Regions:
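Acceptor-binding helix/loop patch of EC 2.4 sugar-transfer enzymes
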Residues: 40-57, 105-141, 182, 186-187, ...
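Carbohydrate-associated surface elements
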Residues: 159, 178
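Conserved donor-binding/catalytic core segment of Leloir-type glycosyltransferases
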Residues: 195-217, 222-227, 238
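Nucleotide-activated donor-binding/catalytic signature segment of Leloir-type glycosyltransferases, i.e.
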Residues: 241, 248-275
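Aromatic "clamp/platform" in nucleotide-sugar-dependent glycosyltransferases that forms part
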Residues: 292
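Short hydrophobic beta-strand element within catalytic cores of glycosyltransferases
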Residues: 309-312
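Conserved acidic donor-binding segment of nucleotide-sugar-dependent glycosyltransferases
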Residues: 324-325, 329-336, 345-350
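A short, well-ordered alpha-helix in the C-terminal region of glycosyltransferases
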Residues: 345, 352-367, 373
């Protein structure tokens, strides 16, 4: 969206984020690296003391993040840039002072998730993050402030929208996530090569994106990995970091306990360039989506767009895209799974799942195609702005 807006005559677009990537740029878009709190390490240490409960720690970090973001944006103002429109998320505190900085701007708020009292029934308790009551209420308060600061609001699935109170829900529009289906597309005679890892689509390959290495290491999938590789003697498992802040070092250390003959079939890859990531999806025999919380992950749509066989948790957001046995497969969210049995069953049916691959690609191409949806999203913003 940023690149498309920048391509329109007369527009100047800034993309502000706490994370910077030297290997990635957007045509016509100026990148702004948001400051993190200067005293972040000291702050984290001080607010991690037993004297502060979880709620106080969350409040403090939200304030520090909002203050650091405001400091960065004041630099933008000092350079003479006064935005007509700002698109922002308020759930972690970055948007706390945006309305104060840009009182005349049209603010568009991204509504990601609102914790409800009956969340246990709307989202299986065992799959919820370990967030006690006070931090949940704090995150809801940040969402509420963002809601009243902004002029219009959007989210990416009906399921997310339904979590908000009725009085807020009616003001939130659903703008579905879109994928570059020309870039994320099946490639015949696919080959993946990155560093020392070289794989082809002829091999049996299970791929998985890692959001939290510690959580994965302690979970059933990692513990069952030796059993899976023992049952599938030609299978390779590739784990990809979802960001430069997600380190796989702890997994590398833990892997030392695995039988030496198996370690060569476990590939731990740090954050990949877009092209390499796409090539990996194209050779994947099965892409496993794990540790998905509230939202519909882009990786699910990207994998389906590449024609992957996808195994994903049965959540409300995922069900809006994936139908079990039609264009992918669902597993019960929050339950302890027999990963060896489940993955083996799908790998054994690999040659029978061509229709699943075609349907996955067809679903994303028809409902989440960037060329179709992005002009609609921009038209929505321009209409609300006018």
């Amino acid at each position: 969206m940023a690149a498309s807006l920048a391509a329109l005559p007369g527009n100047e677009v800034l993309f502000a984020s706490e994370y910077g990537r030297r290997d990635f740029s957007l045509p016509g878009v100026k990148r702004v690296l948001l400051k993190k709190p200067k005293d972040r390490k000291k702050a984290v240490a001080s607010i991690s003391t037993p004297a502060l409960d979880a709620g106080e720690r969350d409040w403090t970090m939200a304030y520090l993040r909002g203050r650091a973001t405001a400091s960065s944006l004041m630099g933008v103002l000092a350079e003479g840039f006064e935005p007509d429109m700002v698109i922002l998320s308020g759930s972690m505190g970055n948007g706390l002072f945006v309305r104060n900085l840009f009182p005349e701007a049209f603010l568009v708020g991204y509504a990601d998730w609102y914790f409800r009292d009956e969340a246990e029934t709307r989202y299986p308790l065992s799959t919820m993050p370990d967030i006690p009551l006070a931090p949940r209420n704090i995150r809801n308060t940040l969402q509420a402030k963002n809601f009243f600061d902004c002029n219009c609001h959007f989210t990416t699935t009906e399921w997310q929208r339904e979590q908000y109170p009725e009085g807020m829900r009616g003001f939130i529009s659903v703008l579905r996530k879109c994928v570059d289906t020309e870039f994320f597309a099946p490639a015949p005679a696919s080959r993946f090569s990155f560093g020392d890892c070289e794989l082809t689509e002829r091999q049996e390959i299970v791929t998985l994106s890692v959001r939290d290495a510690a959580r994965l290491r302690e979970g059933g999938f990692w513990c069952e990995l030796p059993s899976l590789l023992s049952a599938r003697s030609d299978c390779h498992v590739v784990l990809i970091s979802t960001g430069k802040e997600v380190r796989l070092d702890s997994l590398r250390e833990s892997m030392a306990a695995f039988p030496s003959g198996m370690r060569g079939r476990i590939h731990l890859l740090d954050f990949l360039p877009p092209g390499a990531y796409r090539d990996l999806l194209c050779v994947s025999s099965l892409h496993l989506c794990k540790d998905i919380s509230f939202m519909l992950p882009s990786e699910l749509l990207e994998a389906m767009s590449c024609g992957c066989v996808v195994l994903a948790p049965d959540t409300g957001a995922v069900r809006e895209v994936l139908s079990d046995g039609q264009n992918g497969f669902l597993y019960p969210s929050g339950r302890r799974m027999n990963w060896v049995m489940l993955i083996t069953l799908l790998l054994e049916r690999r040659s029978e799942l061509l229709s699943i691959r075609r349907n996955a690609r067809k679903t994303v191409f028809g409902k989440h195609n960037k060329n179709t949806l992005l002009p609609r999203h921009i038209a929505f913003l321009m209409d609300r702005y006018s």
